[in-house]
From Swiss-Prot:
Binding site for Zn(2+): H114, H118, H124
Enzyme nomenclature, EC number: 3.1.-.-
Primary subcellular site in the record, as a coarse category: cytoplasm
Record note on cofactor: Binds 1 zinc ion.
GO MF annotation, one: metalloendopeptidase activity
UniProt superkingdom: Bacteria
Gene3D superfamilies recorded: Metalloproteases ('zincins'), catalytic domain
One biological process term in Gene Ontology: rRNA processing
Gene transcribed to yield this protein: ybeY
Protein name stated in the entry: Endoribonuclease YbeY
Keywords: Cytoplasm, Endonuclease, Hydrolase, Metal-binding, Nuclease, Ribosome biogenesis, rRNA processing, Zinc
Names of required cofactors: Zn(2+)
Catalytic class of the enzyme: hydrolase
A Pfam family the protein falls into: YbeY
Length: 153
């Protein structure tokens, strides 16, 4: 499996994880997948995340992560599949980590893994789907050395 991760920064790089961390988290989420491809991660400001959240989900305010799976039109053939885009709001991630008394790096890892699973088609709208997705997230994060993000502190 070959994966390319493009990182776009709309906030200062000093306030976000290293590109190598993003790549490690994406690869961990894809470890049991045979899919090769490309993913773009945009590290957004709060205003940009709020605009995108309103445009695509009709919800006010910034959210921590938005996932945009790429659907290839049937008339298009790609050498390297585009898996999709993730938009992660750096200020929301920092605030949530503080509020939830989590290490910020662990929260970033969780959100990247969560987003990649959405790009692969996982969802959490129904209880059974949520349990399956959360279980997979916990397993992936533990393989990276991070604690269960759903465990109460």
């Amino acid at each position: 499996m070959s994966i390319t991760v493009h990182i776009q920064y709309a906030v200062p790089k000093a306030s976000v994880p290293l590109q190598a961390d993003f790549l490690r988290w994406v690869k961990a989420a894809l470890v049991n997948q045979s899919k090769a491809g490309e993913i773009t991660i945009r590290v957004a400001s709060e205003s940009e995340a709020a605009q995108l959240n309103w445009r695509y989900r009709h919800k006010e305010g910034a959210t921590n992560i938005l996932s945009f799976p790429f659907e290839v039109p049937s008339c298009v053939s790609l050498d390297v599949p585009l898996l999709g885009d993730l938009v992660i709001c750096a200020p929301v991630v920092a605030r949530e980590a503080l509020e939830q008394t989590k290490k910020e790096q662990a929260h970033w890892a969780h959100l990247v893994v969560h987003g990649v699973l959405h790009l692969l088609g996982f969802d959490h709208q129904q209880e059974v789907e949520a349990q399956q997705m959360e279980s997979l997230e916990v397993t992936i994060l533990e393989s990276l050395g991070y604690p269960d993000p759903y465990e109460s502190v």
